Amino acid sequence: MQELSRFDVAEYNGVLMVTVESELLPPDPAVVVIPLLNNYPAVRHLNPELEHDGQHLVLATRLIATVRRAGLRRVGTVADQGDLVTKAVDVLMTGV
């Protein structure tokens, strides 16, 4: 299985994804991710704009999914913006 950490950016079928699963969980062939898109309608706090590799991309939080690790290729990290990602997941789950 590919080594991925929380807030890593990985490519999956041509789409950039942020891994949001805790590293404290036991290894699994699947991992929870959220797509990073450049043309997604942003809702305040739910869809923060993140910078990756000189691009400004929207975290499409409602499109949260699980994908097979084997299909992911790590291309970077947004760990420095991890608070925005965590807040977005909190808003998705709790509404606040």
Positions of the model-derived regions?
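C-terminal terminal-subdomain/extension
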Residues: 52-96
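Compact nucleic-acid interaction/catalytic patches
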Residues: 3-49
